[in-house]
Swiss-Prot record:
One of its GO terms (molecular function) is structural constituent of ribosome. The keyword DNA-binding does not apply. This is Large ribosomal subunit protein uL24. The lineage of its organism: Bacteria, Bacillati, Bacillota, Clostridia, Eubacteriales. Part of the 50S ribosomal subunit.
Length: 112
């Protein structure tokens, strides 16, 4: 069965907070988004250890730490203006559509 592309409520560059799981309460910036899998990679969240054999490209080998993807349903957008997690509404303006914080009404920055 083919994966269905899921509509994501967060974008690359957004500030988010993890609301469930072992990293609940941690904040970070979204580094990567995988809409087909419904997962996101967040800076300094869900760190896993990767054991690498020595190879020509990496002669040292060893154990490296990196961020692993987590389900996008486990994160919520974090508004830096009101310092709270929030849901997003979309407002139509002359310039186009903008994302707005539901708690304080401030336009959320578009990180492109």
């Amino acid at each position: 069965m083919a994966a269905v592309k899921q509509k994501m409520h967060v974008k690359k560059g957004d500030m988010v907070m993890v609301i469930t799981g072992k990293d609940a309460g941690k904040k970070g910036k979204v580094l990567e988004v995988f809409p087909k899998k419904g997962r996101v990679v967040i800076e300094k969240v869900n760190i896993v250890k990767r054991h690498t054999k020595p190879s020509q490209s990496m002669p040292q080998g060893g154990i490296f730490e990196k961020e692993a993807p987590i389900a996008s349903s486990n994160v919520m957008l974090y508004c830096t203006e009101c310092n709270k997690v929030t849901r997003v509404s979309v407002k139509e303006t002359e310039a186009g559509k903008v994302r707005v914080c539901k708690k304080c009404g401030v336009n959320l920055p578009d990180k492109k």
